[in-house]
Amino acid sequence: MNQIKNKTLPEMTTEQALLSMEALPLGFRFRPTDEELINHYLRLKINGRDLEVRVIPEIDVCKWEPWDLPGLSVIKTDDQEWFFFCPRDRKYPSGHRSNRATDIGYWKATGKDRTIKSKKMIIGMKKTLVFYRGRAPRGERTNWIMHEYRATDKELDGTGPGQNPYVLCRLFHKPSDSCDPAHCEEIEKVNFTPTTTTRCSPDDTSSEMVQETATSGVHALDRSDDTERCLSDKGNNDVKPDVSVINNTSVNHAETSRAKDRNLGKTLVEENPLLRDVPTLHGPILSEKSYYPGQSSIGFATSHMDSMYSSDFGNCDYGLHFQDGASEQDASLTDVLDEVFHNHNESSNDRKDFVLPNMMHWPGNTRLLSTEYPFLKDSVAFVDGSAEVSGSQQFVPDILASRWVSEQNVDSKEAVEILSSTGSSRTLTPLHNNVFGQYASSSYAAIDPFNYNVNQPEQSSFEQSHVDRNISPSNIFEFKARSRENQRDLDSVVDQGTAPRRIRLQIEQPLTPVTNKKERDADNYEEEDEVQSAMSKVVEEEPANLSAQGTAQRRIRLQTRLRKPLITLNNTKRNSNGREGEASHRKCEMQEKEDISSSSSWQKQKKSLVQFSSVVIIVAVIVVLVEIWKESRDAKCSFLFHQLDSFKGMFT
């Protein structure tokens, strides 16, 4: 093979080369790799060995439009790719930018340049370009894509003797938008056949044609349409699209999508039993008639579904949200309350019966909203979801209790005070003198079905039967028979917000206070190096000690209990030993103080003695010096007198 490459082939015309390519059996293709394009074809072309690479013609691609270039290729094939050598045309004489503009449009580079390696050595770069009609920046994108190969070796820069600067262009035509260049790999890896267009299939994602901006994945239905367009692009193909099959595929896909959504909704309902009992005032939320494939099978927003905590931090999101942004708001509470409280003078038979749901799936909440009524505790029995409730032991929605109160001529002002804030309606129910007394206040902190009684213990049952019946006056005796001896007085209920959980810090002081200051000091003295760790435990509040703090289903109380001092014989002995040690310590301190005072007095005396002795020495020295001075003066005077006498004798 190497010998064949090294041999100089005889010069052939284009017609001869064309005939030789057509003489090859079906299935032979010109499919060089990136490494072969750089190391062999581009290297030979730059070094001036044109005859050896004549299979790739030399064309200035910027002087032709992309749809004219396939006719200039030496290799005639049905494959939508062509190879050309293109001389480097600088946009500016002193710059490195290439001029890629044509008469009708321009080639625009997109994406990052990719490296081409040979044995872990970078030998070249590959740039992806897309052809646009018109002029930038308002060009219209087309389906013509080109890969530009350039060598990075300094020996192939085109400045050496006998060299010319060239780049190798690989032209592609993308028949449809089904093959997204941003998500495709090298198109040369696709198995092409001359008589079919299966390479246009949306499942073929082996092209590396990179578009300017990546788009999202195409839906299966759209991809089927793209397949139809792709198959119908070429008129000389043997494979024809079956329109009926494509249409059936689209219909089947739509039905499959709807079935999947229904199954998803049923699965969520089975996993969340509360979702089976979510009626509104006007009927069920979900039904076959109200189902839309674009909407979620569950009415609640997915952000609240399966949440451990309720999303009620100041934002009362009571609407039923769908994926398309629409929402179905709850029934107006004003109309409901007007019907309950302001129409109690009318006959109960003329009123419109209504029932609010006894349980709702408040986002993040997995318990019954109202599972037990204190005033129905004797007459209403609660059983598992598998059991049936019959007779008088049936579950009655909480809103009917307020209606019964109105039927017994209880003042509505005394019964309920509506507070309209943040889209919710809460009630403060004193009800001191009515038939239910404090039970009504402990029953429901809100008429709104989304607000449940936080003081009720959790129930294991999530299903109760819905009842649409009215309570006759004879049933009131059952409520009157209810004893109120052990009921709590919740008239002082304080609404503290809608946070999902409350944590209380309760610190209990020691039961036996230490009154003796000395003993306390002794204990501190003995145990100053000990660290007493507080015993903390989290206990669930008993229902009898709860006060309404919001809408959370559980309350957690953090109790910190300090260690209680134990008064034992050991403590007494330790206290006595501490007192003795303190006394001895004080004696030592006194003795040290005396020693310090005595030493300080001795130091003062010593200092005074030193000062006195120094003064005496100084005085003695002064006296000696004076005496010496006197003697010297007397001697000098006598000497002078003697000299004077000698001079007198000489003159006389």
Swiss-Prot record:
Q: Which InterPro entries match?
A: NAC-dom, NAC_dom_sf
Compositional bias ranges of the Polar residues kind? 198-216
Give the domain of life. Answer: Eukaryota
Alphabetically list the UniProt keywords. Answer: Activator, DNA-binding, Membrane, Nucleus, Phosphoprotein, Stress response, Transcription, Transcription regulation, Transmembrane, Transmembrane helix
Q: Please report a single Pfam family linked to this protein.
A: NAM
* Keyword Membrane recorded: yes
- Where Phosphothreonine occurs, residue numbers? 152
GO molecular function terms listed in the Swiss-Prot or TrEMBL record: DNA-binding transcription factor activity; transcription cis-regulatory region binding
Q: Where in the cell is it found?
A: Membrane; Nucleus
Q: How is the protein disposed in the membrane? A: Single-pass membrane protein
Q: Does the keyword NADP apply?
A: no
Can you tell me where the transmembrane regions are? 609-629
The record's comment about this protein's domains reads: The NAC domain includes a DNA binding domain and a dimerization domain.
**Which protein is depicted?**
NAC domain-containing protein 14
Species assigned in the record: Arabidopsis thaliana (Mouse-ear cress)
Lineage per the UniProt record: Eukaryota, Viridiplantae, Streptophyta, Embryophyta, Tracheophyta
